[in-house]
C-alpha cells in the first residue's frame, strides 16, 4: 500500500457532497482492520427531510452540529449500527453515511450496507463521537486511489428520496486485493 496520508479536519469541514465523493477510494482504519470506502451518502442540514437533524438539535443529533471529522454512530431497526462522518462547518448539521466498503485486511471482503460493515468491523454505539483526526485506532487516510463511481438517489429512506446524494464505486475489479 502507498504511504498513508491521514485526512485532516479540513477535509471533513467542507461541502458534504464533495466530502462524500472524495471519500470514495479512501481507506478506513478501525482497530487493525483496513477497508476501502466504496459507497457513501450525504445528509445535509435541517432542510434535508432525511437528515436526522431535520427537526433540530437533540441529544442524539448534537454530534452532527460539529466540529467536522468526528464519527456519528447510531442504531437502526433496533439491531444495526450505521457509521457517519460529521462534515461542514461547526453549527451546521451534516454527515456522510458510509454505506459500503471493500475490506483489504485482515481478509478480502466486499461489504455492501452500513449495518454489514459496522457488524464486521465491530463498530457500535461506543464509537459515536470519536475524533477521526487524533486517533490511532479509528481514522481515514488517502493512499492516492481514484475509483470511478456513479451518482444515484439515496436508498433505505422514505423522505428526500429525490436527492442524487449517493455515490457508489462502479468498478469493483479495480480494487486492490
Swiss-Prot record:
Keywords: DNA damage, DNA repair, Hydrolase. It holds the Pfam family Pur_DNA_glyco. Its EC number is 3.2.2.-. PANTHER family: DNA-3-METHYLADENINE GLYCOSYLASE (PTHR10429:SF0). This is Putative 3-methyladenine DNA glycosylase. GO terms for molecular function: alkylbase DNA N-glycosylase activity; DNA binding. It comes from the Bacteria. InterPro entries: Formyl_transferase-like_C_sf (IPR011034), MPG (IPR003180), MPG_sf (IPR036995). GO terms for biological process: base-excision repair. Signal peptide: none annotated. Belongs to the DNA glycosylase MPG family.
Amino acid at each position: 500500500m502507498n504511504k498513508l496520508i491521514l485526512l485532516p479536519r479540513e477535509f471533513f469541514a467542507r461541502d458534504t457532497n464533495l466530502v462524500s465523493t472524495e471519500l470514495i477510494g479512501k481507506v478506513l482504519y478501525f482497530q487493525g482492520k483496513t477497508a476501502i470506502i466504496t459507497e457513501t451518502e450525504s445528509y445535509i442540514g435541517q432542510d434535508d427531510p432525511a437528515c436526522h437533524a431535520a427537526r433540530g438539535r437533540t441529544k442524539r443529533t448534537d454530534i452532527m452540529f460539529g466540529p467536522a471529522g468526528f464519527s456519528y454512530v447510531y442504531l437502526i431497526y433496533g439491531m444495526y449500527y450505521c457509521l457517519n462522518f460529521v462534515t461542514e462547518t461547526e453549527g451546521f448539521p451534516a454527515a456522510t453515511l458510509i454505506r459500503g466498503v471493500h475490506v483489504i485486511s485482515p481478509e478480502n471482503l466486499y461489504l455492501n450496507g452500513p449495518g454489514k460493515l459496522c457488524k464486521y468491523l465491530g463498530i457500535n454505539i461506543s464509537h459515536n463521537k470519536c475524533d477521526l483526526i487524533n486517533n490511532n485506532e479509528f481514522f481515514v487516510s488517502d493512499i492516492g486511489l481514484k475509483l470511478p463511481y456513479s451518482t444515484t438517489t439515496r436508498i433505505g429512506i422514505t423522505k428526500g428520496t429525490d436527492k442524487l446524494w449517493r455515490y457508489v464505486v462502479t468498478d469493483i475489479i479495480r480494487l486492490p486485493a
